[in-house]
């Protein structure tokens, strides 16, 4: 029993320490001019098991791709942690900031904190951001 507790504690620390260092990040800009930010909240539809994450993306050169991964560790959700990902292949890259929705299907999230990781690939270059968000059930 002590070994299990120790393994759980070490797992949480392994995730929490590096995540804690990055939790203040709210906006990321690639060196080439692509930028992305994550909405503070994500909406979870409990009946459809889908999580909707909203982004603000600015890029140039045509069409880009946004990929989102959301991890919800224990104790926010049951053990083991919940992880899901989704993408939007139709990000408009015209130099203006656009709202971009990404839906994650098939993962069951609980209300509370979760960690979002976003990568945008665009003709104007990549952008990356990581941030703690709040999952709300509607």
Please provide the spans of the model-predicted regions.
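A broadly tuned, weak detector of single residues within folded domains
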Residues: 6-8, 21, 48, 111
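C-terminal region of N-terminal signal peptides and the immediate post-cleavage residues
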Residues: 19-37
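Short, surface-exposed binding/anchoring microloops in extracellular/periplasmic proteins
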Residues: 33-76
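Short beta-strand segments
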Residues: 34, 127-133
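Ser/Thr-rich low-complexity repeats and stalk/linker segments
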Residues: 62-124, 133-137
């Amino acid at each position: 029993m002590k070994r299990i507790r120790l393994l759980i504690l070490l797992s949480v620390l392994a995730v929490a320490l590096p995540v804690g260092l990055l939790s203040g990040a709210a906006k990321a800009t690639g060196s080439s001019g692509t930028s992305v930010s994550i909405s503070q909240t994500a909406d979870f539809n409990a009946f459809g098991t889908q999580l909707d994450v909203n982004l603000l993306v600015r890029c140039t050169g045509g069409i880009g791709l946004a990929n989102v991964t959301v991890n919800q560790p224990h104790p926010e959700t049951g053990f083991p942690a919940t992880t899901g990902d989704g993408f939007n292949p139709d990000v408009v890259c015209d130099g203006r900031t656009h709202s971009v929705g990404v839906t994650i299907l098939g993962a069951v999230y609980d209300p509370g904190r979760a960690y979002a990781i976003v990568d945008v690939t665009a003709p104007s270059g990549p952008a990356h951001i990581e941030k703690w968000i709040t999952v709300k059930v509607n």
